[in-house]
Amino acid sequence: MGLAWGLGVLFLMHVCGTNRIPESGGDNSVFDIFELTGAARKGSGRRLVKGPDPSSPAFRIEDANLIPPVPDDKFQDLVDAVRAEKGFLLLASLRQMKKTRGTLLALERKDHSGQVFSVVSNGKAGTLDLSLTVQGKQHVVSVEEALLATGQWKSITLFVQEDRAQLYIDCEKMENAELDVPIQSVFTRDLASIARLRIAKGGVNDNFQGVLQNVRFVFGTTPEDILRNKGCSSSTSVLLTLDNNVVNGSSPAIRTNYIGHKTKDLQAICGISCDELSSMVLELRGLRTIVTTLQDSIRKVTEENKELANELRRPPLCYHNGVQYRNNEEWTVDSCTECHCQNSVTICKKVSCPIMPCSNATVPDGECCPRCWPSDSADDGWSPWSEWTSCSTSCGNGIQQRGRSCDSLNNRCEGSSVQTRTCHIQECDKRFKQDGGWSHWSPWSSCSVTCGDGVITRIRLCNSPSPQMNGKPCEGEARETKACKKDACPINGGWGPWSPWDICSVTCGGGVQKRSRLCNNPTPQFGGKDCVGDVTENQICNKQDCPIDGCLSNPCFAGVKCTSYPDGSWKCGACPPGYSGNGIQCTDVDECKEVPDACFNHNGEHRCENTDPGYNCLPCPPRFTGSQPFGQGVEHATANKQVCKPRNPCTDGTHDCNKNAKCNYLGHYSDPMYRCECKPGYAGNGIICGEDTDLDGWPNENLVCVANATYHCKKDNCPNLPNSGQEDYDKDGIGDACDDDDDNDKIPDDRDNCPFHYNPAQYDYDRDDVGDRCDNCPYNHNPDQADTDNNGEGDACAADIDGDGILNERDNCQYVYNVDQRDTDMDGVGDQCDNCPLEHNPDQLDSDSDRIGDTCDNNQDIDEDGHQNNLDNCPYVPNANQADHDKDGKGDACDHDDDNDGIPDDKDNCRLVPNPDQKDSDGDGRGDACKDDFDHDSVPDIDDICPENVDISETDFRRFQMIPLDPKGTSQNDPNWVVRHQGKELVQTVNCDPGLAVGYDEFNAVDFSGTFFINTERDDDYAGFVFGYQSSSRFYVVMWKQVTQSYWDTNPTRAQGYSGLSVKVVNSTTGPGEHLRNALWHTGNTPGQVRTLWHDPRHIGWKDFTAYRWRLSHRPKTGFIRVVMYEGKKIMADSGPIYDKTYAGGRLGLFVFSQEMVFFSDLKYECRDP
């Protein structure tokens, strides 16, 4: 019954198992891309090489274009699997060439119009880029610090679920990434009909360069199982924090909160219905009858086998030539044949005779093989004589010779090896002198031996002719010998020396020990005989009586091994780990003292506790994370040191940012350590984010924010027009930017000369289009309303413009506060506003708008940071911001003690604030003097956009320098800039010549973002922003045109501007003017003026009344530049990494060219590490 039941279960398992997800590559749970493309077979485009996994092939990619795509039917299976799982696991091992950019996988459209999806390893930027194209829009998500292009083998595990992505490199978890669209919106049902899957093939210059192995899509398992199988530690499970929130009411297909494969219902596992199960039960009942019959048959066979086994147990016998022999018995048939009995089988073998190294070998009577015998004959051992040589002379007396060879191994070979005789052919003419000449060489003699190594010999005579009449004798040797080789001579084996006796099996009472020897002196070779005798030998040892065990009294320290000797003495072994001593007395070792870095050192404290025995490390300090080692002994402490790393909530998933927000890590010294910032298209406090249509940082609807409830949580008072300041003069809930009558005086703002002051009469005494009610100089024409000292009295009518107490007519800096009126160069312009304070230049001419007068401007800048060498506080180290916190004339970038407190920067816990006492009350590594305010500018670090620069704490363009780029001519006006939101929003209102509004803050590495909006249907030209500004001839510009158009003036050069976003570097040899104007309009390169670094290949222009959000990242140290432009929540254009080191930083600003009503809103800049 048990057998029948077991067979039934096996049958059921077999039926159900047909629908399991196997782990091999022949199902839809694992898709090996190389195998599917046929690349695993020999072919062009790749070369088979050795990889880290010896069980599968690795390929060096030589030409990815020649590697075929995945077949459509297999690709369709993959698409179905991705859609069913709502994600995938991508595994790959790669060795990518250093600093290269290469595509691992790509879904390429069959019509060659682009890619639907790609995974690209960007070695230049150190990122893994995921590019998705949905409804014609490209979305790029980058996983930062993915250092794959190192020339070393790396293993990646990419886990994509819905709109989330998680990357592991080897066993290390990278930062979470969020896709802009769910992955299943890319892997549509009809994807296989419009696209194909390619490996290593990307766009132009994006093919993978290096070696790939085990590129596979995996389904039906978890990242934790994959990483565990790779040998990653179990702590990896703690890092699996990818959000698996319920989407549209359904749970994700790939889960990360359990171990093992995902659970499926019975129907999904077995794939059979209840009716089929009922039918199977009936069949099993029939099977039971058959099995019962089989049991009876097996029982009968068992009995027969027992009888047969009894027969086989009888001692085996052999019969040979009618004689019976016992098992293992040996006998000799004749002198050349020996036999033995083995398990009833007679085995006979012929004796193999070696080759004899002599010519007189004979077979003795009663033996099988011949022997060499010594001989008394003088000719024994010699080979036969060779033939006589030719006569050595053609005339006169000559000689002939012949030779023979000796077998010197077995014979004495008495006698000569050469015989000589005279010969005479004819008489010679002796009347003249002649030199001697050699005769021909004699034939070579036979080899001197019949086996092994011997020699052969030949001779010649100086008689062809013989020297006469004082002729010269022959030169050279008369005899020549060389080696000859016969078959190797047989060598009989000889015993080597006995080995020492091994250790006796007991220490007393009589034991056994043995020794052995080898047949290797010499080893039998070339048919020689084996050694005769035994290989091993035994003898009795330690016959004396056993003494009393001295270890029975436990004389050693607990845990120490005790060794007893025959004479009753004993010996203790080494002390246990964690102790030191002689084994009898052991004392605890202080591992914390012996290994001073065994545990984490924090603020000079070694966080280690010594125990008896062993030690343990204290937990990592607050805001740090790491292991807590413990153990025993110095060796353990040295090999298992504690490592505590600063905790980063943004990467370990412990932050509470909204899913539509980005987590920005501020450092482990900040409290809190991170800041949440809503992504483009959303607004709020980062914990709660709501829709933001106009991208000005304010949500469309009120949000219920817990803390600081009014900050960017209040409903946008102009939801369709950017107004980051939310100004509302009449408090009617409609922002000034979209309120047609802000002051409610019944006069529309576009005709109101005081739109923010109630003045229905519209009086304007000075006719400057600014009404008397709001005119800061009502009797002086001043449409710009400039008010330098912000006292309410305009500059046009103020007696003291800068408010320094010195009247304008006596003030040498009318627009700059300078009570001392110092004027070093006596040019009438005070030092505070003099662009050449040490050189006389009353005209203050500054042709290149770099704030250095032409008189003292030499433009010599070796480090390209925008500050000429004689004015640069670090002339050989780029530091565009010129930060100098101790005001010692040496910039922080090249100053080893930035705060001049006597503590070197690398040891100072407040690098920018003097604190010689280095007091740190909470022991977090940040001194009390700069706690929560590193640069001591009274702005908390969490709110400070440049926490390491006391001169910059918030974004502010209220003060800016206007730079005209085409100052000559009257075809258009200069730009007109309106400042709002305390300098965080600017509006350019007129159709104008190219111009800039450049702020005065200077930056090294910087992030710059803002909202771009064209609030008119008129015109279709350029607007954008500048960065790295150093002068009007040297800057980077990002500019955007709506439609393709040629510039109306073709002089001095023809300029064709294409629609789309461009990134350009300006290095003009002429400066502002018509050359630079046309070069800026032109999309492309203009020698001596402008070079285009990148232009949007899709040529997408801006749209009227549409909000866009840009994000710029500039890292001058590496030359990294990246510009991303969002339209709403989606990325509209992405330059990707651009590298250019023309300028090492500078100022930021805004750019317009022939375009009116350009809104630059919610401007933000932030200092970044280089």
From Swiss-Prot:
A GO cellular component annotation here is:
extracellular exosome
What range(s) does the TSP type-1 domain occupy? 379-429, 435-490, 492-547
Which intervals of the chain are annotated as region Involved in retention in extracellular matrix (ECM)?
Answer: 531-1152
TSP type-3 repeat ranges, renumbered to this chain = 691-726, 727-762, 763-785, 786-821, 822-844, 845-882, 883-918, 919-954
Assigned protein family: Belongs to the thrombospondin family.
Please give the organism: Homo sapiens (Human)
Outcome reported for the amino acid change (mutating N1067K): Loss of N-glycosylation site
Sequence ranges assigned to domain TSP C-terminal in this UniProt record = 958-1170
Residues of the region (Disordered) are 839-934
VWFC domain location: 316-373
- Chief place where the protein resides: secreted
In which tissues does this protein get expressed? Expressed by platelets (at protein level). Expressed by monocyte-derived immature and mature dendritic cells (at protein level).
Gene that encodes it: THBS1
Annotated protein name in UniProt = Thrombospondin-1
The signal peptide here is 1-18
Q: The EGF-like domain covers which part of the protein? A: 547-587, 646-690
Protein origin, superkingdom = Eukaryota
Q: Where in the cell is it found?
A: Secreted; Cell surface; Secreted, Extracellular space, Extracellular matrix; Endoplasmic reticulum
